[in-house]
Amino acid sequence: MRRMIPTSFSSKFQGVLSMNALRCYVSEFISTFFFVLAAVGSVMSSRKLMAGDVSGPFGVLIPAIANALALSSSVYISWNVSGGHVNPAVTFAMAVAGRISVPTAMFYWTSQMIASVMACLVLKVTVMEQHVPIYKIAGEMTGFGASVLEGVLAFVLVYTVFTASDPRRGLPLAVGPIFIGFVAGANVLAAGPFSGGSMNPACAFGSAMVYGSFKNQAVYWVGPLLGGATAALVYDNVVVPVEDDRGSSTGDAIGV
């Protein structure tokens, strides 16, 4: 029995560092970098266009459109490689649902975090006249309320991801990412003025790291992670129960 333990551990470790797994991590890095660059950059762009006053409707509309388009594209370009997570909340939900292993999820998170920080650093270095914006909670909201709101938004987003990636629905490859982007854009429109409509811990982490302030950072982790995990459990166990032989089909569906 003692000989089987290191062998099993070694095989799992080799799987996490296999060439296919490394391709997934690189894919997540590229897609997350692109998304964060567009999502955070759109806020800086709207600030520039409106001379610093982003309190009007266009202050939310521009980032919402950018989030929708960038997320659709980011998910699409990595869909067949890594599953197009682009979001630690999605990765966490996939791990909770048993579609990826916990070690793989940790490497996904690492790729996503590094990509987010790098994207925000690029914005900081290239746009010298502005600081990198961070997600903030509106004055009329509490931290708990913002966490609940972010959790609900993440639930809707992750539920859409599970629906779009379900091979039993037979959706064309290009359709799923479009719907995922639509939901993200709608969520930003709905919650942008209140919590920022992040839904993505990596995006919030990268901007906070570069800006140098982690105030209320827990809001953008606890809410999305719990919301995403709940969506995974509800989809797989209540709405569309997964069959016993789901292992091979769902594995192919998310690209890992």
Swiss-Prot record:
GO terms for biological process: pollen sperm cell differentiation; urea transport. It is a multi-pass membrane protein. Its main location: membrane. GO terms for cellular component: membrane; mitochondrion; pollen tube. A motif (NPA 1) lies at residues 87-89. The chain crosses the membrane at residues 24-44, 57-77, 89-109, 144-164, 171-191, 222-242. A motif (NPA 2) lies at residues 200-202. InterPro entries: Aquaporin-like (IPR023271), Aquaporin_transptr (IPR034294), MIP (IPR000425), MIP_CS (IPR022357). The modification Phosphoserine is found at residue 249. Keywords: Acetylation, Membrane, Phosphoprotein, Repeat, Transmembrane, Transmembrane helix, Transport. SUPFAM superfamilies: Aquaporin-like. It is found in: Membrane. Pfam families: MIP (PF00230). GO terms for molecular function: urea transmembrane transporter activity; water channel activity. The keyword Cell cycle does not apply. The modification N-acetylmethionine is found at residue 1. It comes from the Eukaryota. PANTHER family: AQUAPORIN TIP5-1-RELATED (PTHR45665:SF27), AQUAPORIN-8 (PTHR45665). Aquaporins contain two tandem repeats each containing three membrane-spanning domains and a pore-forming loop with the signature motif Asn-Pro-Ala (NPA). Potential aquaporin, which may facilitate the transport of water and small neutral solutes across cell membranes. Belongs to the MIP/aquaporin (TC 1.A.8) family. TIP (TC 1.A.8.10) subfamily. This is Probable aquaporin TIP5-1. It comes from Arabidopsis thaliana (Mouse-ear cress).
